[in-house]
C-alpha cells in the first residue's frame, strides 16, 4: 500500500477479491513469498450479505443473487491457499478477547529451552488474547506472524 497504489486502485480497504487478484498477479510475476502486515479481522464489507444489509428496497430476486455470489473473504482465502507461500498477520491484545466461532489454530505451543538459557516463560510477556483474521483467510495461510502495533 502506497500513494501510487491508492491512486490507482482507490481508497483502502480494497475488496478482498481485488486483493486476491493482486496477489495472483504478484505470484505470476515471480513473487517467492508474500507476507501481509495487515490483519483482516472483520468480514469484507463488500461481501453479498453486507451489501444486502446496506441497501434499502432491494427485491427478493436481487437479494438472492447478491447472497449467492461467492464471498470476497472466501475468494481471497482460496487464493492464499493456492499460492502456498503467504503469511498473514496477527496481533496480541492486552485484554482477553474470545471469539466464540474461532477455535485456536494450535492447541498448544511446544516449548524448548537450551541448556543454561533462561526459561521462556520468565521473559515472554503474557497476553490476554490475540486478534486474528477471519477464518476463511486465517486457515488458508502457510504461516502466521505476530505484528507489534
Region roles according to the model:
Residues 1-149:
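Non-transmembrane functional regions of envelope-associated proteins
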Amino acid at each position: 500500500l502506497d500513494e501510487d497504489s491508492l491512486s490507482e486502485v482507490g481508497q483502502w480497504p480494497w475488496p478482498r477479491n481485488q486483493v486476491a487478484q493482486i496477489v495472483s498477479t504478484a505470484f505470476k510475476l515471480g513473487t517467492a513469498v508474500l507476507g501481509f502486515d495487515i490483519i483482516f479481522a472483520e468480514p469484507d464489507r463488500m461481501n453479498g450479505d453486507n451489501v444486502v444489509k446496506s441497501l434499502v428496497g432491494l427485491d427478493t430476486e436481487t437479494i438472492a443473487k447478491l447472497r449467492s455470489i461467492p464471498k470476497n473473504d472466501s475468494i481471497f482465502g482460496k487464493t492464499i491457499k493456492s499460492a502456498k507461500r503467504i503469511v498473514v498477520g496477527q496481533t496480541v491484545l492486552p485484554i482477553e478477547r474470545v471469539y466464540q466461532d474461532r477455535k485456536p489454530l494450535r492447541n498448544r505451543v511446544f516449548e524448548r529451552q537450551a541448556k543454561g538459557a533462561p526459561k521462556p516463560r520468565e521473559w515472554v510477556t503474557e497476553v490476554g488474547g490475540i486478534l486474528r483474521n477471519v477464518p476463511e483467510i486465517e486457515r488458508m495461510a502457510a504461516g502466521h506472524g505476530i505484528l507489534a502495533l
